[in-house]
Amino acid sequence: MFGFIHESIRQLMIRTYGEAFWSKVLERAGFEAGKENIINHYYSDADTFSLVDAVSVILKVTREQVWEMYGCFLIQYTMETGWDDLIRSMSPNLKGFLDNLDSLHYFIDHVVYKANLRGPSFRCEDNPDGTITLHYYTGRPGLYPIVKGVLREAAKRVFKLDVSMTITGRTQRSVQMATGERIEEHVIFLVKTLNTDQSNEEALGTAVVQHSNNYKIRLTHMDFISTFPYHMVVDQDCKIVQVGRELYNHIPKDLLSVGTPLMRIFEVTRPQIPLDFDSICNFINAVFVLQVKTTPMEFQRNANKRAAQAIEASENLYEDNNGALALSQSQHLKLKGQMMLMSSGGHIMYLCSPYVTSIPELLQYGLRLTAMPIHDPTRDLILLNQQRLSDVEMNLQLEANNEQLENMAKDLEVEKGKTDALLREMLPPSVAQQLKQGLSVEAREYEEATVMFTDVPTFQQIVPLCTPKDIVHLLNELFTKFDRLIGIQKAYKVETVGDSYMSVGGIPDLVDDHCEVICHLALGMVMEARTVCDPITNTPLHIRAGIHSGPVVAGVVGAKMPRYCLFGDTVNTSSRMESHSPIGRIHCSENAKKCAESTGRFEFEPRGRVQIKGKGEMNTYFLLRSFKRSIWEIIDRRRDENCNSIDGYNELREGYVDDVLNKVTQKNSKTCSIS
């Protein structure tokens, strides 16, 4: 169905039950919010019924009740959206309004929205008791409650009438149409006016001119077929009696001879009825659209011309594919007009014009505007509709652009999220937020922070014996484990250079236990490193670490690829602690030891005075364990009770891991584990 139907259903539900209710309907119907009410989009009947069924289930009412409620609202919403004047000007009485329902529906579908939808058909009959019998035909069974709602609301709003509607008959049958077989539902309504103080006859008025047969029509046969170049007259057997002269330009002359059955030349596309005399009389108030069955004359003339040219050029006619292409693009002429029962009662005249609403359609039929009589409003309609089509095309383009912009905005948000995540990886969150806001980040001096460097002492021996891919895999596996620990311990990763990994505590967010955090991080890194295998010896990898506490200056360096860098003697001393550390040990300065013990409880082993390059002799220490947290708590992993010590610090002793690994069978894995 047309998107207007979905939008009007949405408006009804939101106005009556609120936005939250409509969200529930969309969720149950399986629609994405915003995709269910695109005005110029065609939705399948299944989509529309899924919305109505969802409303029915949530409200706990029948589908028929929902459709009838919608019918009442449809008139209100239609009149609100610019159709008020047209609906009120259709007829002075209810009977005339019902007679023109078919034409109104056709106009909205085919002219305004250019939708070519399978709309319903209506036929109206007066009854002697003043009631009206309304026949409703549709190819969509089950929608008849909409008619009840529409008619009652229209009678009330337009004619100030209260009407009752009773269903006196409802049948379904299979109808063979040109497009195939379909199920057609026929519902008969008895419409009765309740406030009888107003009559349908009141507004009919009286004739201004007296009927007279004293004068004969002063119009010859040739004048008539010239004035109405597309008309046809048929008898009770629906055989041709008379045709307009322009039809000969589109239909072979032998088919337009007197006595040719109308159904041999045309097929009826609207209303969906058999092409016989009685059916036409039943729908005499409807708009009739007939389509020529035969090959368009324009195509035949072009085909004959191409054949003659091919013969002259001694070409094989069957090798010319242009004919097939032209046939597929050719248009069978459609006629639209009114069927009129002539006074004799035995003939019907079809006053019509080519069903053309735009310049491109006019050209497809091989027509020009001069083919239309000057009095024919089709000329004005084509010109006006050409402008309307331009407006519709612009609206469609705007809708497409809006949808594209929405999708681009969503994609932009996704990419922005990725960029923000990457920026947060490169810079501290607080610093990254300042840069996003366009603020400059000034360098800052921190009175005390703790810096740690770690590296792989055997890295220089590993590199010559491995492929670059193996080296990258090794470092990626190792640093991924370190990054996880950084997140657990709430420290900050500054940078990695080769096999060196630099981290800091107390920067950029000030904390009192920055050295305690880094000490726990160091213990965890030594433990996690041993779960990575040396690709040469296939043994657990050993790292070393150096820690120092002191004043640090931190700031953002660079514009194109900004980096958060640390400067000062503390950074240099920390690097010296790492470079002078034995393999597998955590080497700390005296400042770091004192700072760690001020907030935490650790076991340190004095190393004595060590000659440090550029610093002279310094008192240094080895970090052995934390008394506040076990290794398993630090690395956030479960302990294997079968082979792991209670606190995990025994595993840090050099050689202990090798003893455990000898007892545990490992299957072709490049990752070592102590569990």
From Swiss-Prot:
Cofactor, free-text remark: Binds 1 or 2 heme groups per heterodimer.
Assigned GO CC terms: dendrite; guanylate cyclase complex, soluble; neuronal cell body
UniProt-annotated binding residues for heme: 105
Subcellular localization: Cytoplasm
Keyword NADP: no
Residue span, Guanylate cyclase domain: 450-578
UniProt-listed GO biological process terms: cGMP-mediated signaling; feeding behavior; response to oxygen levels
Pfam family, one: Guanylate_cyc
Activity regulation annotation text: Regulated by molecular oxygen, which binds to the heme binding site. Probably not activated by nitric oxide (NO).
Presence of the UniProt keyword Metal-binding in the record: yes
The enzyme's E.C. designation: 4.6.1.2
Disulphide bridges, residue numbers: none
Keywords of the record: Behavior, cGMP biosynthesis, Coiled coil, Cytoplasm, GTP-binding, Heme, Iron, Lyase, Magnesium, Metal-binding, Nucleotide-binding
Effect of residue 499 to A: Little or no effect, suggesting that it acts as an beta-like subunit
Note: There are two types of guanylate cyclases: soluble forms and membrane-associated receptor forms.
Subunit structure: Heterodimer; heterodimerizes with gcy-35, and possibly with other soluble guanylate cyclases.
Function of the protein: Plays a central role in social feeding behavior by synthesizing 3',5'-cyclic guanosine monophosphate (cGMP) from GTP. Oxygen, which probably binds to its heme-binding sites, may regulate social behavior by modulating its activity. cGMP is a common second messenger in sensory transduction and is implicated in oxygen sensation. Indeed, C.elegans exhibits a strong behavioral preference for 5-12% oxygen, avoiding higher and lower oxygen levels; a higher level of oxygen inducing a naturally polymorphic social feeding behavior.
Name of this chain's protein: Soluble guanylate cyclase gcy-36
